[in-house]
């Protein structure tokens, strides 16, 4: 067996085992050193793949795809800076515990750290952001192929086991790279005969749900049963079963449930949008729970965190399904690592009688809904608030939603309409909360689900990932991209630094003065720019009923946006004061 044949077999075995382990979608960036891997993927009938000239975009697409499917998409690249471009997506996947597998091709031993072209130190390049990383050997008949299978299987297992996250396998190859088949029997391949003729993976790994321990549950049930005023918080969660169980628990106990946008519950007709009450300082002063039970990860709004610092509840219990720490304010009194669903189920029935807050809460949210509707009346200029409200009203059940960080996700978290019988599947990048790679992640999310998607994105995040617009028309499904163009970093206008005129505009707002129209034309996308809420509603309905992808650009003023947000929050604060009888 010559070297090309050896490399071909080696790469084919790797790709086949990845597919059998469930990692069957590959994000490939063109390159010479990775030729054996690309050829093996292209020639495997069970593989699905997409080509990416930009590795950075590929990394975020893989992230979105894994968010949708629950399985790692495999990133394949050549040597050099190609692999370094994955780092932002790897950081997000690590922080948000999303499975990911990087398969980077590399130079062999004799070409490393000697001045050879396109060669960097790739092994360990992602540092602490991987769950596992391994320098694979150069293909050799002296290495049993069973060890290669076992290593691939372990890599996928490490990506999927708690805590989920990225795995990096660095594979050196020697030239030549072109595939060459081997027709003669090889003793080296004989131990793999059963594997080659079957369809099962070499190793089957289980990922069981972790049950909460009995002592912790006994304590938590007792605290919940005896609490004067409990509060349940549903934070970032990627599992629909977890979300449903938390909602059912709150209904069973008849206590308030603060459901963050990332919890999967925000749009549900059975959930009250407590964000609108928590924004009121008067409400936060009056509502003082003595027990807070926090399921899942972080929250978008800072108001619950501010409230916790103010309340200092007797007990703050955090339930998360991974071993990572979640205690941003260092006030957790009970920490449970277990399945969110199983923990929520185990808490049911430990309390009787509805919270005194529930009746006035329903009155408040009815009035708040009317106030938001008035602020987004059809003839008013379209704004970030109106955009979020209308999108949440119009999205059909078969559509996905992806929200960019900064203002889009906050506007939706605060003002979304509740009333969906089947909550919209919503994606965000809240692991590290960056604005990079948003279009790429949304495209991967849509492709992974195989459903049309609506993306809300700000102008700076749009520019940051502009080249990813080239992906949209190659997807199986259309995307409605809502570009909130306030000519700069709108979120900074809410911060104290905005009062310093001499430094704010050029150094924080950073206006870019561009339109999305030329970008739509360049990448073959439809385009519209509505001016009023009524026009935006019509544009969105038209886009939702089309099989073409569209950019809907909403041009708005940063200063006017701040005024609208603050005016509406003030009116909601007055309603909260009246509804909850705050003196």
From Swiss-Prot:
EC number: 2.2.1.9
Note describing how the cofactor binds: Binds 1 thiamine pyrophosphate per subunit.
Keywords from the UniProt entry: Magnesium, Manganese, Menaquinone biosynthesis, Metal-binding, Thiamine pyrophosphate, Transferase
Cofactor(s), names only, from the UniProt record: Mg(2+); Mn(2+); thiamine diphosphate
Gene Ontology MF terms in the entry: 2-succinyl-5-enolpyruvyl-6-hydroxy-3-cyclohexene-1-carboxylic-acid synthase activity; magnesium ion binding; manganese ion binding; thiamine pyrophosphate binding
Superkingdom of the organism of origin: Bacteria
Gene3D superfamilies the record matches: 3.40.50.970, TPP-binding domain
A Pfam family the protein falls into: TPP_enzyme_N
Pathway named in the protein's UniProt entry: Quinol/quinone metabolism; 1,4-dihydroxy-2-naphthoate biosynthesis; 1,4-dihydroxy-2-naphthoate from chorismate: step 2/7; Quinol/quinone metabolism; menaquinone biosynthesis
One Gene Ontology biological process: menaquinone biosynthetic process
Catalysis: reaction(s): isochorismate + 2-oxoglutarate + H(+) = 5-enolpyruvoyl-6-hydroxy-2-succinyl-cyclohex-3-ene-1-carboxylate + CO2
Coiled coil: none
Similarity remark: Belongs to the TPP enzyme family. MenD subfamily.
Protein purpose: Catalyzes the thiamine diphosphate-dependent decarboxylation of 2-oxoglutarate and the subsequent addition of the resulting succinic semialdehyde-thiamine pyrophosphate anion to isochorismate to yield 2-succinyl-5-enolpyruvyl-6-hydroxy-3-cyclohexene-1-carboxylate (SEPHCHC).
NCBIfam families membership: menD
Subunit architecture: Homodimer.
Record protein name field: 2-succinyl-5-enolpyruvyl-6-hydroxy-3-cyclohexene-1-carboxylate synthase
Organism per entry: Chlorobium phaeovibrioides (strain DSM 265 / 1930)
């Amino acid at each position: 067996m010559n070297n090309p044949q050896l490399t071909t077999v080696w790469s084919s075995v790797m790709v086949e085992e990845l597919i059998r382990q469930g990692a069957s979608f590959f994000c490939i960036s063109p390159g010479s050193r990775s030729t054996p891997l690309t050829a093996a993927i292209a020639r495997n009938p069970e593989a699905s793949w997409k080509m990416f000239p930009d590795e950075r975009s590929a990394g975020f697409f893989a992230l979105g795809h894994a968010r949708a499917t629950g399985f790692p998409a495999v990133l394949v690249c050549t040597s050099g800076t190609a692999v370094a471009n994955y780092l932002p997506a790897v950081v997000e996947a690590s922080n948000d515990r999303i499975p990911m597998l990087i398969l980077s091709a590399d130079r062999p031993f004799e070409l490393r750290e000697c001045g050879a072209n396109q060669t960097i130190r790739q092994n360990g390049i992602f540092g602490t952001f991987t769950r596992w990383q391994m320098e694979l050997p150069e293909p050799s008949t002296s290495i049993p192929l069973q060890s290669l299978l076992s290593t691939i299987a372990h890599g996928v297992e490490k990506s999927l086991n708690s805590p989920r996250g990225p795995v990096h396998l660095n594979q050196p190859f020697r030239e030549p790279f072109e595939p060459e088949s081997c027709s003669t029997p090889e003793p080296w391949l004989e131990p793999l005969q059963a594997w080659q003729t079957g369809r099962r993976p070499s190793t089957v790994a289980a990922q069981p749900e972790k049950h909460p321990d009995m002592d912790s549950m006994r304590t938590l049930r007792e605290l919940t049963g005896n609490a004067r005023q409990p509060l349940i918080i549903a934070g970032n969660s990627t599992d629909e079963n977890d979300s449903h169980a938390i909602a059912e628990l709150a209904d069973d106990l008849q206590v308030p449930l603060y459901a963050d946008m990332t919890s999967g519950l925000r749009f549900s007709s059975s959930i009250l949008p407590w964000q609108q009450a928590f924004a009121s300082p008067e409400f936060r002063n009056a509502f003082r729970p003595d027990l807070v039970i926090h399921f899942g990860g972080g929250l978008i709004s800072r108001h619950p965190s501010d409230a916790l610092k103010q309340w200092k509840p007797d007990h703050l219990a955090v339930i998360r399904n991974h071993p990572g720490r979640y205690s941003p304010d260092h006030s957790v009194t009970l920490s449970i690592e277990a399945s969110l669903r199983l923990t929520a189920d185990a808490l049911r029935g430990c309390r009787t009688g509805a919270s005194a807050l529930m009746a006035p809460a329903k009155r408040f949210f009815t009035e708040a809904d009317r106030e938001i509707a008035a602020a987004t009346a059809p003839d008013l200029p379209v704004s970030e608030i109106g955009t979020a409200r209308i999108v949440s009203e119009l999205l059909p059940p078969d559509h996905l939603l992806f929200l960019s960080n900064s203002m889009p996700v906050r506007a939706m978290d605060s003002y979304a309409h509740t009333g969906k019988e089947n909550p919209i599947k919503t994606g965000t990048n809240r692991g590290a909360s960056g604005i990079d790679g948003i279009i790429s992640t949304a495209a991967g999310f849509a492709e992974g689900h195989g459903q049309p998607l609506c993306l809300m994105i700000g102008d700076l995040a749009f520019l940051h990932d502009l080249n990813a617009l080239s992906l949209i028309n190659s997807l199986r499904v259309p995307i409605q991209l809502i570009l909130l163009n306030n000519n700069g970093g709108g979120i900074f206008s809410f911060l104290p630094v905005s009062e310093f005129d001499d430094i704010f505009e050029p150094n924080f707002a950073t206006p870019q003065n561009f339109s999305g129209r030329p970008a739509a034309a360049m990448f073959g996308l439809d385009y519209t720019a509505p001016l009023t809420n009524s026009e935006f509603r019509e544009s969105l309905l038209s886009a939702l009923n089309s099989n073409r992808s569209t950019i809907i650009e909403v041009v708005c003023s940063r200063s006017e946006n701040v005024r609208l947000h603050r005016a509406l929050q003030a009116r909601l604060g007055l309603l909260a004061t009246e509804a909850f009888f705050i003196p």
